[in-house]
């Protein structure tokens, strides 16, 4: 069983009750309560997450193409980099948004080039950030094909977070294939399309995770930091 952890122990709050045995209990409780509940933001792995200077969270997105291929992504966003354009409330992911899922804002119109300088959330610490993603597809894939899809899915992180894959991050994408739908004779073309969909879904799920997150402690939620009238 593949696994990864999201480090959220230095974000404030009382951690005295988090004894080692509690993590086993958390996993058991999560598996026992699995269902169709689609809560996002401050839930599950997103509860203690932060993203740059904003509260991070749990986000999801999905796509289905005209051929019945379906992709779904779940992201726990605890990134060092920011998901919004510097000086603006728009997400880096805005071109890929569907149905106003993270605010439905118009295209951003920065007056100046995007600045190269990055204002970090600070203080600089050991690598304690990461964005973890799980991507599921209904295609029948071999292990090498699944690996290629996971590689392409990582592009979604690069679209949604700046900077990304930094020395402070441990970004990771897990991909699983349910095997319900076989690829056509145009295998590489199918894989290209599915890989494109995985990247789009990861990108959107990252933005949704931050958009849906609520303020917690000293970390402001996106909609508190950027009220509607700003």
Which positions does each model-derived feature cover?
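A structural signal for small-residue-enriched, beta-sheet-centric alpha/beta enzyme cores
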Residues: 1-230
